[in-house]
Amino acid sequence: MKVQIYQLPIVFGDSSKNETQITQWFEKNMNAEVDVVVLPEMWNNGYDLEHLNEKADNNLGQSFSFIKHLAEKYKVDIVAGSVSNIRNNQIFNTAFSVNKSGQLINEYDKVHLVPMLREHEFLTAGEYVAEPFQLSDGTYVTQLICYDLRFPELLRYPARSGAKIAFYVAQWPMSRLQHWHSLLKARAIENNMFVIGTNSTGFDGNTEYAGHSIVINPNGDLVGELNESADILTVDLNLNEVEQQRENIPVFKSIKLDLYK
């Protein structure tokens, strides 16, 4: 499976400019060999929290329409990061994915809001865990958002249910880059799966984002990584490595869920 990871410099509070940028990246970099494209967290407006009432998408209307067009045009699955999204008069940080036929194949509201950013004052937390879902080729994957990375429990269910890739879409700060590397590697090792961390880069107010989008294999080895610059990472994944690792280290056969509280 060939995956392209878009490490974008999100334009703060301007969904139109961000859509234009994404469109240009597709036009310049897309080719028929790519199976999946991945975008970062909150790519429509960034963390312009105080103005999301006016700027957030409405029930994924514009964001889905935009991504659907790209998926159908380029015949590629898109793990479409996440966007600020108003639904039932509440604002969510909503991740979604669209297959190459233009179908919405996943939607997930960020469960864990970041207290350090006072997200709870502006956003509503999701009430459902991330689910496994199928890409066009039948591969089961799952999609989580940024701060979710610090909660290993959230990935356990989709991993045990057969997901072979975990996509963490993020706007992760430079000040915690060490945590980014360590936590992504841990999630890959403990679940015997590929983990792909897609981050943004540049500045959002006083916050510098770390970049360093990264792919880790089921053994915890580095497959590919960007630096802090805006760029695209393209990797080829051998998904047979997941089954091989799960046979070699059968953690899900050893797990004792009845003992855990």
UniProtKB/Swiss-Prot annotation:
UniProt KW keywords: Hydrolase
Keyword Nucleotide-binding: no
Residue intervals of the CN hydrolase domain: 1-239
Matching InterPro entries: C-N_Hydrolase, C-N_Hydrolase_sf, UPF0012_CS
PROSITE patterns noted in UniProt: CN_HYDROLASE, UPF0012
Catalytic residues (positions): 41 (proton acceptor), 110 (proton donor), 146 (nucleophile)
Pfam families: CN_hydrolase
UniProt-listed Enzyme Commission number(s): 3.5.-.-
GO molecular function, one term: hydrolase activity
Stated family: Belongs to the carbon-nitrogen hydrolase superfamily. NIT1/NIT2 family.
Protein name: Hydrolase in agr operon
